[in-house]
Amino acid sequence: MQLTLRAARINAGYTQQQVHNLTGFARSTLTRWENGAAMPTIGDLIILCNLYEVSVDQIKWQ
């Protein structure tokens, strides 16, 4: 099953503020990543996937 970053975050039960608190990523950066306006580095993507408990392969890009 493919998920957007936003869907993966919501399915994991996190708000953007909680992800910010846990990772240090700015909320504006998270929004850009979730909207497809910017791409996270592979390292940042791995951090998010670990937090959301999904594999990188499960993330769908717009």
Regions found by a protein language model. Give the residues of each.
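DNA major-groove recognition helix of helix-turn-helix/homeodomain DNA-binding modules
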Residues: 24, 43-58
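A short, Lys/Arg-rich alpha-helix, primarily the initiator
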Residues: 1-11
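The alpha-helix within a helix-turn-helix
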Residues: 9, 20, 49
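Short alpha-helical DNA-recognition segment
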Residues: 13-32
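Short, conserved catalytic or interaction motifs in soluble domains
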Residues: 35
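Residues within the helices of the helix-turn-helix
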Residues: 6, 17, 46
